[in-house]
Amino acid sequence: DIGTSSICGVVYHPSTQSVISVTKENCANISSPDNWEKKQDADIIINIVWDIVREFQTRYKDIGGIGITGQMHGIVYTDVQGNAVSPLYTWQDGRGNLRYKDNLNYATHLKNITGYPAASGYGLVTHYYNIQNGLVPADAFKLCTIMDYAVMKLSGNNTPLIDPSNAASLGIFDKEKL
């Protein structure tokens, strides 16, 4: 589980029904002069995830699968090689609450133009703010959640695949148009 303050891994052994867990501090926070801005270093997070995976691989040789959970509203931008080209903008990021047009904040403005619920901290509200303010990295090719980024890195791929449940958590999602 890739949480905002900690990252943990769990091994479940079905024959003995035993559970072993490892928890590590998520020390990836990036300081900012703006108190509304909440970012983390995506590569530090991935290094912690890899540390946990390696620890389990050393202790347990017959791991049959890996499941990933974590912060579901935040986004990280990736380039065509699948490398992070931005920090992880976490679910706590408040840029969507900043004033925009017609005395509305970014989240409300996006909700009004799309017709979909939108809240500050949701990935597509963050992305909307970043677009409007020229903050999307020039080499950004995709965006994804930190879980999708972790799965991409663990599997050796260079394009994130977003599960519909994660896509829905970013906001502005219509399950009927899947």
Language-model segments: residues:
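Short, compositionally biased low-complexity segments
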Residues: 24, 101-103, 154, 158-159
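Gly/Ser/Thr-rich active-site cleft segment
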Residues: 2-4, 110-178
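Conserved donor sugar-nucleotide recognition element shared by glycan-biosynthetic enzymes
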Residues: 45, 49, 96, 123
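Short beta-strand-loop/turn "lid" adjacent to the catalytic site in phosphate-handling enzymes
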Residues: 54, 58-90, 116-121, 151-174
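Carbohydrate-associated surface elements
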Residues: 93
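Short, charged, surface-exposed secondary-structure boundary motifs
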Residues: 31-36, 98-102, 171-173
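N-terminal glycine/serine-rich phosphate-binding loop of ATP-dependent small-molecule kinases
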Residues: 2-87, 112, 139
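Acceptor-binding helix/loop patch of EC 2.4 sugar-transfer enzymes
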Residues: 102-110
